[in-house]
Swiss-Prot record:
Residues 339-715 are cytoplasmic. Residues 376-676 form the Protein kinase domain. Residues 283-296 have a biased composition (Low complexity). Glycans are attached at N126, N195. It comes from Arabidopsis thaliana. It is an enzyme of class 2 (transferase). It is a single-pass type I membrane protein. The gene is LECRK81. Keywords: ATP-binding, Cell membrane, Glycoprotein, Kinase, Lectin, Membrane, Nucleotide-binding, Receptor, Serine/threonine-protein kinase, Signal, Transferase, Transmembrane, Transmembrane helix. GO terms for cellular component: plasma membrane. InterPro entries: ConA-like_dom_sf, Kinase-like_dom_sf, L-type_Lectin-RKs, Lectin_legB_Mn/Ca_BS, Legume_lectin_dom, Prot_kinase_dom, Protein_kinase_ATP_BS, Ser/Thr_kinase_AS. GO terms for molecular function: ATP binding; carbohydrate binding; protein serine kinase activity; protein serine/threonine kinase activity. Residues 22-247 are annotated as: Legume-lectin like. This is L-type lectin-domain containing receptor kinase VIII.1.
């Protein structure tokens, strides 16, 4: 008990010294907590700093936390320690036009924004504007600003000429990749050291990319605003802040874990921050010099001696503090006991289930999801996933519109498949993956809650919409799915094999950005480990032939499925065309899409595979490139298929497309007793036929192939 009392007294003494602690974090950035300037906007919990346009433009946007934060103690000007973790992405709609970047910024000004272009929205014309401290992530090498290259991080004070810079290529980070990038920015007010770390992983690197001494109190006022600024410079870059946390305190170092994301999950709803109605911003002079550490030694004993004098001169006050501390601790313990007893009495839950999903984002109550879906009314059904029905729901507390997937299977095996979706996607974060908001396990039900995608699934946009999906949207969708798969295969902690990439599992947001969903069949594999044989499952037309025969899913099986999606999106035809009398296709056309496109490629007219509904409104060079990439991904031999990272590079023009043979190769899979050709596996659009007439001691059992209908739709 004495330990708690000592801690409580030390906290109260911090208040006597006028110290202020600030802490906040967001999963869905609430508009009430943010101040948006310029082109900045909030959509689906993501802050966009610049405009989402397909034509080159110049603009700037800024987002700030709405309350000023104390950065110096009153009187002493002692600097705060702070830590900020955030996830961001920089995507280029048109890879040929690059220029701009974003910055984490600390500024006394919450009402103005700098100019577009290379200034990142930080400064006005000719470098004018308010004072600031910033960490920039720059995608353009500007000699006027002494940039080291077009892929760097830099530390700026009152201008965009960085005093310290780091090449992100040295840590294998590509700002323009479109992938989610995590950054940790930390300042220790005791040691006066400023650190910047960057990674694709949720784990903070052991060695920061920037680390240098800094007297922060020379460059900040007592109160400052924190946030982000971004700009474009005649480009189509989109700068997005996907998640953000911030914490600060006086008189102590923030631990190494400060500002890090919660374990393998997206974050919860915004927490109430501890900022206490600070006084108006003081107008303090700020040096414009580039930060160079002084040799000023920090007298850490001064605060403790101050505490000692206070204790000697005010014994009555200290006694009162101790008494009050004991009372409030007892009150706090009683409140905790009451809250937890109510929680445990509320509903029975499976302990084993809770341990499996400890990494998931948020737990919803069955009551609120039932109310949000009108008692799971049939009128709210918007699709069917691999293992459940998907409902449109409205969360009663927030009014957010969500998609609720309800497990429709009672067997434990099916529930385990359903749970795999939760355990996998809950640990992932990428702008082209459907975001899992939370879960519920009550009354024998398993429910998953996702962001609702207003434009539905890709297959509905292709085949059921009254409007033709334009070529620019199709290109963006294919690039988004490729980026998501590249992330799953090589850029997250454990490799994730999706195993069910198809158009009905690709969702479209309000801007027709692709979001890959349905991880019910996905499997996690440690990098560089061989996959184990499992039951082959998926949808005919998207399944790689070697996966059908061996049951071993690898990243190349996902590549094959992606190739089928590419050809489907470009041609407007399903991988296996069941209706040969569709008006826009001639009667007698090969029902197998890959074979049909490969035949056109052999004849030198592969662009004829383009969807006739596009009416020729596309660039033929782009069309040819995308179709050849689709054929390369559809190669019967997995060894000749590209990786998804190389596919991304091909689509944006950073790499040449591979040489694809004019005739479709005939790949055979054999053991000492079996030779089974590709045609044997894909000749039937509804079944998988194994030629039993061949003499063999080895076979693929019929129950090892699960074919799913193209009518499966999910979120």
């Amino acid at each position: 008990m004495s330990l708690f009392l000592s801690f409580f007294i030390s906290i109260l003494l911090c208040f006597f010294n006028g110290a202020t602690t600030t802490q906040f974090d967001f999963s869905t950035l609430a508009i009430s907590n943010l101040k948006l300037l310029g082109d900045a906007r909030l959509s689906n919990g993501i802050v966009g700093l610049t405009r989402d346009l397909s034509v080159p433009n110049s603009g700037a946007g800024k987002v700030l936390y709405s309350n000023p934060i104390r950065f110096r103690q009153p009187g002493t000007h002692f600097p705060t320690s702070f830590s900020s973790f955030f996830s961001f992405s920089i995507t280029n709609v048109n890879p040929s036009s690059i220029g701009g970047g974003l910055a984490f910024v600390i500024s006394p000004d919450a009402n103005s924004i700098g100019i577009a272009g290379g200034s990142l929205g930080l400064t006005g014309p000719n470098g004018s504007g308010s004072k600031f401290v910033a960490v920039e992530f720059d995608t353009l090498m500007d000699v006027d600003f002494k940039d080291i290259n077009s892929n760097h991080v830099g530390f700026d004070v009152n201008g965009v000429v960085s005093s310290v810079s780091g090449d992100l290529g040295t840590v294998n980070i590509d700002l323009k990749s479109g992938n989610t990038i995590n950054s940790w920015i930390e300042y220790d007010g005791l040691t006066r050291v400023f650190n910047v770390s960057v990674s694709y992983s949720n784990l903070k690197p052991k060695v920061p990319i920037l680390s240098f001494p800094l007297d922060l109190d020379r460059y900040v006022n007592d109160f400052m605003f924190v946030g982000f600024s971004g700009s474009t410079q005649g480009s189509t870059e989109i700068h997005s802040i996907e998640w953000w946390s911030f914490s600060s305190s006086f008189g102590s170092s923030l631990g190494s874990g400060s500002g890090s994301p919660p374990p393998r999950a997206n974050l919860m709803n915004p927490k109430a921050n501890s900022v206490k109605s600070p006084p108006p911003l003081a107008s303090q002079p700020s040096s414009s010099a580039i930060p160079i550490s002084s040799n000023t030694q920090l007298k850490t004993s001064s605060s403790s001696s101050c505490h000692s004098r206070f204790c000697k001169e005010n014994p009555g006050t200290i006694a009162g503090v101790v008494t009050a501390g004991a009372f409030f601790l007892a009150l706090f313990a009683g409140a905790l006991f009451w809250v937890y007893s109510k929680k445990f009495k509320r509903v029975e839950r499976s302990d084993s289930f809770a341990s499996e999903i400890i990494k998931a984002p948020k737990e919803f109550s069955y009551k609120e999801l039932k109310a949000g879906t009108k008692n799971f009314n049939e009128s709210r059904i918007i699709g069917h996933g691999a293992f459940g029905v998907v409902y449109r729901g409205i969360l009663p507390e927030t009014g957010d519109i969500v998609a609720v997937k309800r497990c429709s299977h009672s067997s434990q095996d099916k529930k385990n498949e359903f749970l795999s979706e939760l355990s996998i996607i809950g640990s992932l974060r990428h702008r082209n993956l459907v975001r899992l908001q939370g879960w519920c396990h009550e009354k024998g039900e398993i429910l998953l809650v996702y962001d609702l995608m207003p434009n539905g699934s890709l297959d509905k946009a292709l085949f059921e919409s009254r409007f033709t999906l334009p070529w620019d949207h199709r290109k963006k969708i294919l690039l988004g799915v490729a980026s998501a798969l590249a992330y799953l295969h090589r850029e997250c902690e454990n490799q994730v094999i999706h195993r069910d990439v198809k158009s009905s599992n690709i969702m479209l947001d309000e801007s027709f950005n692709a979001k890959l969903g349905d991880f019910g069949l996905a499997r996690q594999i440690e990098h560089d480990k061989s996959p184990e044989a499992t039951v082959a499952a998926g949808t005919m037309g998207y399944l790689a032939p070697e996966y059908l025969l061996t049951g071993r899913a690898s990243e190349k099986t996902d590549v094959f499925s992606y190739g089928a999606v590419v050809l489907e999106v470009v041609s407007g035809r399903r991988p296996i065309e069941k209706d040969l009398n569709v008006q826009r296709h001639n009667v007698g056309v090969n029902p197998n899409l890959v074979e049909w496109v490969w035949g056109l490629y052999k004849e030198g007219k592969v662009s004829a595979a383009a969807d006739s509904r596009l009416e020729g409104k596309f660039d033929e060079g782009e069309m040819w490139r995308v179709l050849v990439v689709g054929l390369a991904c559809s190669h019967p031999d997995p060894a000749f298929r590209p990786t998804m990272r190389s596919v991304v590079q091909m689509l944006i023009g950073e790499a040449d497309v591979p040489v694809v043979p004019k005739s479709r190769p005939t790949m055979s899979f054999s053991t000492s007793h079996l030779l089974l050709s590709l045609q044997d596996t894909l000749s039937d659009c509804n079944t998988v036929a194994l030629n039993s007439s061949r003499s063999s001691s080895w076979s693929v059992p019929e129950h090892n192939v699960i074919i799913r209908s193209d009518d499966d739709h999910l979120v």
